[in-house]
């Protein structure tokens, strides 16, 4: 199993941090990220510096975009929205040199060590690059068998969110329609000895897909992880110095004649709960403050 993160940031620092954290690969996202080619190249350099495998997700099936991503040093390309065998063959052709494809040739680029790399070795090296195809729609599912028969595919990557939209349940990636479609792709790809990958930001789903045989796991994004941590730290800061416990006393209208509930949340959270408790007189008791009715 290998693990990586989608990177949206233009700053190579975030790529370096992923390498220091010992992830296996990084997906530099040109489909939904704000990258220029030069920014991508700097992120690729940061990945290689820190022992990460740099993969570029291009914005579309494009000979120019795929070739350029590989010229600047990416060791793999991830191509979105593949729907049929014809598109799959084009992706392979654009990514590899003869005899595996027809990628445009320039030896004065990073991938060829700016012409220092032996030209024969440079041509041979394209067979070692990763070609990753994203299947994320009903058309891809309909044409799955013919796509999997295309030679030169290294990884099939299932895009759960676009797939959910295509199946009529947008965003509901745990819907049985989505899960069954994904399981079908995984099982058929495994029969062809093709590695399968997917995206998730849910540990429970990581376990599920690992047990199913998914080996290439992209967990969340750098921006998403930063938001999650930033939010958690902020919430912790708000609690610093506050009373650890606050109590709510329900009126004797309750069957047990009154009940104390220990609550470890902020005033805002308590007020929200109180608003939901209808037909009960509730008094707020805080250390040193009694019968202060909210």
Identify what each model region corresponds to.
Residues 37-71, 93-101, 123-126, 174-197, ...:
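Alpha-helix-loop-beta-strand connector modules within alpha/beta enzyme cores
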Residues 64, 101, 237-294:
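Catalytic cores and adjacent flexible loops of soluble metabolic enzymes
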Residues 1-5, 116-127, 183-184, 190-191, ...:
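N-terminal amphipathic alpha-helix/helix-capping segment at the start of soluble metabolic enzymes
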Residues 14-41, 160-176, 283-294:
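Glycine-rich, proline-tolerant flexible connector loops at the mouths of alpha/beta enzymes
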Residues 1-12, 54-59, 129-142, 195-200, ...:
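Active-site mouth loops of central-metabolism enzymes
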Residues 76-87, 156-165, 214-233:
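Glycine-rich phosphate-binding active-site loops on the catalytic face of alpha/beta enzymes
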Residues 64, 74-151, 165:
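Conserved anion-binding
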């Amino acid at each position: 199993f290998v693990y990586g993160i989608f990177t949206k940031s233009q700053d190579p620092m975030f790529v370096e941090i992923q390498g220091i954290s010992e992830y296996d690969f990084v997906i530099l996202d040109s489909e939904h990220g704000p990258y220029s080619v030069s920014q991508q190249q700097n992120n690729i350099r940061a990945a290689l510096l820190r022992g990460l495998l740099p993969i570029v997700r291009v914005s579309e099936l494009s000979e120019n975009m795929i070739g350029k991503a590989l010229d600047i040093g990416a060791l793999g390309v991830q191509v979105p929205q593949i729907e049929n065998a014809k598109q799959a063959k084009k992706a392979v052709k654009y990514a590899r040199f003869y005899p595996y494809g027809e990628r445009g040739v320039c030896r004065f680029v990073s991938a060829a060590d700016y012409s220092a790399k032996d030209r024969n070795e440079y041509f041979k090296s394209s067979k070692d690059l990763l070609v990753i195809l994203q299947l994320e729609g009903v058309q891809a599912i309909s044409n799955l068998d013919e796509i999997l028969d295309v030679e030169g595919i290294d990884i099939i990557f299932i895009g759960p969110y676009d797939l959910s939209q295509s199946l009529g349940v947008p965003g509901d990636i745990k819907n049985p329609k989505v899960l069954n479609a994904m399981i079908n792709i995984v099982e058929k790809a495994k029969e062809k000895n093709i590695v399968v990958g997917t995206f998730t930001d849910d540990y429970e789903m990581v376990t599920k897909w690992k047990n199913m045989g998914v080996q290439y796991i992209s967990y969340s994004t750098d921006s998403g992880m930063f938001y999650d941590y930033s939010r958690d730290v902020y919430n912790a800061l708000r609690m610093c110095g506050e009373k650890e416990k606050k109590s709510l006393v329900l009126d004797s209208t309750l069957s047990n004649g009154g009940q104390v509930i220990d609550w470890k949340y902020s005033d805002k959270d308590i007020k929200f709960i109180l608003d939901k408790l209808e037909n009960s007189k509730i008094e707020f008791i805080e250390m040193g403050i009694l019968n202060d009715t909210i």
